[in-house]
Amino acid sequence: MIHQQDYTAYQTYALLDFNISFEKDVPADDISRAVIEVTERIDINKFVDFTHRNSHGYDGLMMLRLLLLAFADNGYASTRKLAELCRTDIRYMFIAQNQKPSHQAFQRFIHDDLIMSVEDIFYEMNRIMEDELPIDTDVLCIDGTKYEANANKNTFIWRKNTVRHRERQWKKCNDTIKRINKFFKEKNINCRYSILREPNIDYLLRVTDKIEIYMKDNGIEFVHGKGCRKSDIQKLYDELAKEAMKLFEYALHFDMLGDRNSCSKTDPDATFMHMKYDYYNHTNVFKPGYNVQVGVSDGFIRNIYVSSDCSDIQTYIPFMEKYKLMYGKLPLKTPADAGYGSYDNYMYCRENGIELFMKYPGYYEESKKTNDKNRFRASHFERTEDGGYICPAGHEFEVDKVTTDTRGIYARNNIKLINHHCDGCPFRSRCTKSRIGRSINYCKELDEFHKEARKNIT
């Protein structure tokens, strides 16, 4: 049997410093290494202010790299998400060298030390890469997509509903004012308020102020609560004040809408628009969202524009103006789908020396071979030398009227053609349902733009 004596051991312990490195774990073509390489070539003083940083703070270059990696990899990352990535993602551990900045450290860095916004840094990086890499900036491919906003889908505001409800509310206000006039007339008081046609909140507030003065002069007190009987004038006062507040709410809705037809109460910048349809749950049809436009050159994202417009047509010119503001020039070619092919966009390209590479509505329909199904479409009609149309029966359309449309950015001349030979035509039932005959609206300048775009694309 082995016996062990009790004793106290005096022994020094030396802790070994294990510095874990992820140098071999991060691939050579990973985006984190690209961020490190780009930040090594730039003047970091343009982005980070080192003048008031404490000696015990995190390295400003490291924090900038972590921030750029998060936005390049995820598009957006909150400060808490950044702190979580530094604890769980080896790419962030590789840049941070196993340091774990808290979300407060990232917040202080963004608020106190970061000179430029993330968007300005994005464009500055693009300028640097344009000088370092062979990027063909003459061609900018444009496309857009819709992102759902972080807003409840039941917080909608519709312009038509707001207009209708405001009109009804104003009628109630006028009825209340008539009852107020009747009240003063019965009291033999020479006081009469006008009935306005258009809603005017200031006018209603002046009326309520006058009623308050009347009640104060006559010793009538405002009473509220259970068991209190309101006077007749107070009832009228409460009704008018409630209706005025409702009109004020509608005025706020119009300010939130701007020139749009819908918006969200919790996110006024978001517009209700059609999303991609979910064929499994039958959802995502109409929700608040944003229209995000992206321009790419040689695989590099050169420009981003976030819009509240539901369609892509109205986003093209603001998108290009932002590109010109950031880079000082415009690309020579902007290939895009048919959602961008409009008269205003083509005119903008013509004025700024941009070649027409945008498709237009009906582009694929025109490329189809003429058959018995599509022969009655205007795009498959024969054309005359001066741009007129000839119907399948061989009759030429005549000019009915010429109008000028000034609703867009550029004025355009629209020509309405009408065919007076539809009576007795054997194709009439398949060609038109109009009583006066088949009519076509077209613009000569837009037709020329379509021909040029079709030639450039093919």
Q: What are the residue ranges of the model-derived segments?
A:
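Anion-binding and metal-coordination hotspots
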Residues: A9, H56, L67, G75-T88, ...
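Basic, short loop/linker segments at the boundary and entry of helix-turn-helix/winged-helix-like folds
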Residues: V26-F71, Y442-K444
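Hydrophobic alpha-helical membrane-insertion signals
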Residues: M1-S32
